[in-house]
A protein has these predicted regions:
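Conserved Rossmann-fold NAD(P)-dependent oxidoreductase catalytic core, especially the SDR/UDP-sugar
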Residues: 178, 182, 187-258, 281
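Active-site Tyr-X1-5-Lys
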Residues: 251-280
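Glycine/proline-rich active-site loop of Rossmann-fold NAD(P)-dependent oxidoreductases
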Residues: 275-278, 290-304, 322-332
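Substrate-positioning beta->alpha
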Residues: 205, 309-321
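N-terminal Rossmann NAD(P)H-binding glycine-rich loop of SDR-like oxidoreductase domains
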Residues: 96-123
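Mid/C-terminal beta-alpha module of Rossmann-like enzyme folds, strongest
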Residues: 316-368, 395-399, 403-406
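NAD(P)H-binding glycine-rich loop region in Rossmannoid oxidoreductase-like domains
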Residues: 111, 129-201, 213
Length: 406
């Protein structure tokens, strides 16, 4: 899953671009003039909030005002349906006094989810890599204090391989949101050690802790569209949905180890849930708007040169709704639409004709139908997905507000 703002940044290159995220340097070939810890991306051990998003790892230490601005500007983007709006007050009352755990809380989705949970009345135990690192936790405390909810936010050290610590965090909680997952945008020398084992064992440790804690009624696992595709065997012309699973053999042959790790982790979660009787639901987001660039994709993987787009606020809301609604079950594909690079560039050029947006050749690969995707299960729960026009506008305006583009 690729960082949408980064792609827009690449599309909207202008001469006065003065501050450059180091994660984008390979793509833009522009030297970075300012670097410091990023306040929105998880770091250190490569543990992030997602979710299939190809997030920066320890090697990428950046000042990321874009993400901060994006969180701010996108605050109102995800809309509740009329029915859901009427239920907000009731659910806030229901959530009062409830405590939930969020792993990967300092990341892009995690931070948005924490804010929404606090707004809804939950006490939140926010799992981060280093609670003493202000660069990692400062924005969490700030958003809680700004909402007058500082006393209901509790930050704890979250090591996915430390089962005892996870159990301590889960005790007394009614729900667990598992977002953290190892990820890297760089080639890995040992996929098993660096990605697969931590992803699978980390997920299982969270589920074991939730089961042993006793009071957890539901666990929401953040998977990814990377666990849904690529799937070369999926019927041509049929848009992938929750029934589709990534072809692990295909990914292993093509070195797509992140997709392998997310797929195996989700399958392990479903196996554990079935064997142990734990209530687990899964959200599979597509491209979440954020300051991230994709790993290189070779020609044999041109099938992945499409973007499954979704607003970060929609993703956060989806997590809450599948937790709160007893009827929610199984996987929940969380995307607004499927589009190609050529479509994306054309839409940006249409909305912002003053920018010199590069043109991409029309996609001609078989099976790459342009299709609107209705994530029917989430829509039924009350999610109204932000249209691609709004996703683009929010992203571009965030870049403009921070001086990345004029």
């Amino acid at each position: 899953m690729y960082g949408f703002l980064s792609h827009l940044h690449c599309l909207l290159q202008v001469a006065n671009l003065t501050v450059q995220c180091s994660a984008m340097v390979p793509c833009l070939s522009i030297n970075s003039k300012a670097q410091s810890d990023c306040d929105c991306c998880a770091r250190s051990k490569g543990c992030c909030d997602f979710v299939g998003s190809g997030v920066p790892t320890a090697s990428i230490k950046i000042q990321c005002p874009v993400a901060t601005a994006t969180r701010r500007s996108s605050h109102q983007s995800a809309q509740l349906s009329e029915k859901t709006t009427r239920e907000v007050g009731q659910r806030r009352a229901m959530a009062s006094g409830e405590t939930v755990v969020v792993t990967g809380a300092s990341g892009f989705i995690g931070s948005t989810l924490v804010r929404r949970l606090l707004d809804r009345g939950y006490d939140v135990r926010a799992g981060v890599l280093n609670p003493d690192d202000k660069a990692e936790t400062g924005h969490l405390h700030a958003l809680a204090a700004g909402a007058g909810e500082g006393r209901r936010l509790h930050v704890f050290r979250c090591d996915l391989l430390d089962g005892a610590a996870l159990l301590d965090a889960a005790r007394g909680c009614s729900g667990v949101f598992h977002l953290a997952s190892p990820c890297t945008i760089d080639p890995v020398s040992d996929p098993q050690k660096q990605l697969i084992v931590p992803a699978v064992e980390g997920t299982l440790n969270v589920l074991r802790a939730a089961k042993e804690a006793g009071g957890v009624r539901r666990v929401v696992v953040t998977s990814s569209n990377a666990a849904i595709m690529p799937s070369p065997g999926w019927p041509a012309g049929e848009v992938p949905d929750e029934r589709c699973w990534t072809d692990i053999d295909y990914c292993e042959k093509n070195g797509l180890w992140y997709s392998v790790s997310k797929t195996l982790a989700e399958k392990a979660a479903w196996k554990f849930a079935a064997e142990e009787g734990l209530d687990v639901v899964v959200v599979n987001p597509g491209t979440v708007m954020g300051p991230i660039i994709p790993p290189a994709i070779n020609s044999s993987m041109s099938v992945l040169l499409r973007l499954l787009q979704v607003h970060v606020e929609d993703v956060a809301l989806a997590h809450i709704l599948v937790f709160e609604n007893p009827s929610a079950s199984g996987r929940h594909l969380c995307i607004e639409s499927i589009s190609h690079w050529s479509d994306l560039a054309a839409k940006v050029a249409e909305l912002y004709p003053n920018y010199k947006v590069p043109k991409f050749p029309k996609d001609t690969q078989p099976g790459l139908e342009r299709a609107e995707v209705g994530s029917k299960k989430l829509i039924a729960l009350g999610v109204q997905f932000s249209p691609i026009e709004k996703i683009i506008r929010d992203a571009v305006e965030s870049l403009k507000s921070r001086g990345y583009i004029s």
